Amino acid sequence: MIQLYKKANPNELTQKELSDLEKEIKNPKSDTVSDQFVDFILWTRGLPSRQKSFAEFVSKKLAKFPNARILEVGCGRTAILSRILADKGFNVTCLDKIVDAKFTNGLPTIRATFDYRTFDLSDYDIVIAQEPCDATEHILRACKEQNKIFYMSLCGVPHKIIDGDMPKNYQEWYDYLLKVSDGYAKLIWLSLDPLTRTAVLKSKAGL
């Protein structure tokens, strides 16, 4: 099955990512699995990828704002989420330090690291992100300070906070993010696919 997946490469993985996935399939981890592994299992069952499931969820929320200017932070190399939303008619700009414009089908592209202390969100109405890792706290702080609507699915493992400390586990990290939001955001749990439950941090107002 992995050979068929590698040939189809539905999630546009690099050769290294495909090689790492094959190794993980042959030698599964006992505690955690990679996002690529989850998408592989979804594919073998004929189910949508995580990006497609999150895009479907977000698009229903964004339908209330058909002309909104949307920024996806942490879109990755191929900006799959942004492209799916653009195909649905939304006005999307994609941002990531590794985004490759040859994959983005002409979408506005910003190749940069997102930093809440320097990034001006005035050109955008809504910010979205899917598991943006170290950018998570930056997105939260930027949207709070600049009063922007946002939807962000969270990684299932903790990431360093801006001051450099590392939370002990995902729950401690989520609690920290809610404390930083100071009432601006709330955390919800969603079943976007049959395999996992996804934590989504969102602004309380707007959507």
Predicted regions and their residues:
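A short SAM/SAH-binding and catalytic strip from SAM-dependent methyltransferases
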Residues: D125-L140, G156
